């Protein structure tokens, strides 16, 4: 069980109790980056053009930094430790806590993510994503829990997410040749700035999502959101089920509620 305890109706300084079973399958090998108990100032961890990399955060580990991964296959980030971005820029230059682009067979499991400067998990153009039993605590505007952009074959399960902004968002940006041609200004700039985020992707399809057995708490925005910032790309086979919404203070007059399809 994952529990929030609030004293005297104070929902901003509540106590989280997030127990876990011990992890008895600690990985070993040359492909493993191991963070043991204690504080680790990792800075920016960059992973590119690799296969089979494992980042393991053991119980008692607090890793300070953020992650950027691109063109990685079979990447795993797991353990019982904490990944914290409290030392990162939370001002004008703030970046997501973890960014993944063109990463196939990505797994994130067991860890606690806290104090993201921006989106917590930004996953772009990736296939075969499995997120299991992670915990998130984000307090800042734009602290989305998970933003999937043009991803396919995604399973999210057993998470506990308390974020100021949206918890799970499924987006579809567009950078097909036809779309770029119709959104290019005479000076060569793009009228749709989101093109830069997905330019060069192999595929823009958005399909096959299952989000199940999760606990959501959004302070300001939606807990579950499908379709914001869509650019002419179809959404197919997306399923949310058996999830719990602890808190929903979303106040959008056009798309209100714990979940919205926009």
Predicted regions and their residues:
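Extracellular beta-strand-rich solenoid/capping regions of secreted or surface-exposed proteins
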Residues: 1, 40-54, 62-78, 85-107, ...
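Beta-strand-enriched, solvent-exposed domains that form extended recognition/catalytic surfaces
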Residues: 1-28
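M14 metallocarboxypeptidase catalytic domain recognition
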Residues: 8-12, 38, 60
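N-terminal domain-start segments of secreted/luminal proteins
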Residues: 19-53
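Short hydrophobic beta-strand that contains or immediately precedes a catalytic carboxylate
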Residues: 34-35, 56-57, 67
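Right-handed parallel beta-helix
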Residues: 52-54, 59, 73-84, 104-115, ...
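Structural detector of coil-to-beta-strand junctions
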Residues: 66, 97, 120, 143-145, ...
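Glycine-centered low-complexity coil/loop motifs and glycine-rich tracts
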Residues: 228-234
């Amino acid at each position: 069980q994952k529990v929030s305890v609030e004293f005297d109706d104070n929902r901003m300084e509540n106590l989280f109790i997030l127990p876990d079973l011990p992890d008895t399958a600690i990985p070993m090998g040359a492909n493993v980056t191991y963070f043991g108990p204690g504080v680790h100032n990792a800075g920016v961890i960059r992973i590119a053009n690799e296969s089979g990399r494992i980042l393991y955060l053991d119980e008692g580990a607090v890793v300070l930094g953020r992650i950027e991964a691109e063109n990685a296959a079979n990447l795993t980030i797991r353990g019982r430790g904490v990944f914290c971005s409290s030392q990162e820029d939370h001002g004008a230059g703030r970046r997501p806590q973890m960014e993944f682009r063109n990463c196939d067979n990505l797994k994130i499991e067991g860890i606690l993510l806290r104090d993201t400067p921006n989106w917590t998990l930004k996953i772009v153009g990736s296939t075969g994503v499995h997120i299991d039993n992670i915990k998130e605590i984000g307090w800042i505007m734009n602290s989305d829990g998970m933003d999937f952009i043009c991803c396919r074959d995604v399973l999210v399960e057993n998470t506990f997410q308390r974020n100021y902004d949206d918890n799970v968002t499924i987006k579809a940006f567009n950078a097909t040749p036809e779309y770029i041609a119709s959104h290019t200004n005479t000076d060569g700039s793009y009228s749709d700035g989101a093109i830069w985020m997905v330019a060069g992707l192999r595929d823009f399809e958005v399909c096959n999502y299952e989000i199940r057995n999760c606990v959501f708490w959004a302070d300001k925005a939606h807990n579950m959101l499908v379709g914001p910032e869509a650019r002419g790309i179809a959404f197919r086979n997306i399923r949310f089920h058996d999830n719990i919404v602890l808190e929903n203070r979303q106040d959008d007059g056009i798309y209100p509620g714990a979940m919205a399809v926009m």
